[in-house]
Amino acid sequence: GGLSNLLFKCALPEHILSVGDEPRQVLLRVYGAILQPPHVSAGLPGRGAAGAHCLRPQGVDSLVLESVMFAILAERALGPRLYGVFPQGRLEQYIPSRRLRTEDLRDPDISKEIAVKMSRFHGMVMPFNKEPKWLFGTMEWYLKQISELAFPEEEQLKKFNHLKTYNLQEEMKSLRELLESTPSPVVFCHNDVQEGNILLLAGHEASSSDKLMLIDFEYSSYNYRGFDIGNHFCEWVYNYTYDFWPFFKASQENYPSRQQQLHFIRHYLSEDSGRRGDTTHEEQARIEEEMLTEINRFALASHFFWGLWSIVQAKISTIKFGYL
């Protein structure tokens, strides 16, 4: 499953006894082909230069750093346990669960818990480069690779040539200018909080306030808060389980309304209140309005980022999906 990696559930046969506290089931994650810009990928410093078809992660340093991140998140009950790593992937805790569906994101209780989980995630202090270079650094790298791409198939080439008629460099310049004028705190971001990266844990009551778990931290980095929330709101629109080509469906009317956004923001801020201190009603209302502007401006960056990512994936990915 997923659009970047291959996932396999592995289990011991019933007649094989487990040794010590070893798990009987694990999740095997095999990294897919994904473009890795040097020094900005996943927020991990020190990555070596990567070619257009490299597999992540690159080098021992980045493997160690990503494993550290995964282990810290597991220790804080924000992610699955890590059982082992190897250059092409890792072994993770298998958690009985199901991934959320797109329509689940609109459920007020689920949206509330996602907001709380994201706020906790943003409150973490991680041992990584805290400068917010990931967003524009990665997009610049994608643009460079896109300028060198060639597609042998006529249908892909036609779509690619149409995309090139847009001045992507100018679009990014305008986007950068807009976001530089938009205050947004730098926090440790997941950067891909879509329904497929949120588990609904089996055996938890529907009314439980701790029934969800974020997974898939490959894009996590220090980044602007507005991007993480704005990107999540964009994901309300997309269903990636569509059975027919291009294997996704976009319903723009599902983008969260003002009230749905405020519902999310208020629960996000309620979890963050311990770090911010008490606020008056007027201050709370001002913060909410500022966040609405911040989030919806950074949602534009989400569209642009994943648009560039998708062009590159159309060239290098072996997963059957309508990237272009």
Question: Which stretches of residues belong to each language-model region?
Answer:
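ATP-binding pocket architecture of kinase catalytic cores
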Residues: S4-N167, S174-F188, S207-D210
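Catalytic-loop of the protein kinase fold
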Residues: F188-H190, E195
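Catalytic activation segment of kinase domains across protein kinase-like and atypical kinase folds
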Residues: L199-F247
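C-terminal interaction modules of eukaryotic adaptor/scaffold proteins
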Residues: K320-L324
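All-alpha amphipathic helical-bundle segments outside canonical DNA-binding/catalytic cores
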Residues: H281-A299
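Short regulatory "switch" loops immediately downstream of catalytic or recognition motifs
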Residues: K9-I16, A33-Q36, S147-F151, I198-E205, ...
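Active-site activation/catalytic loop segments of kinase-like enzymes and analogous catalytic loops
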Residues: G226-H281, L300-T318
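Protein kinase glycine-rich loop
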Residues: G1
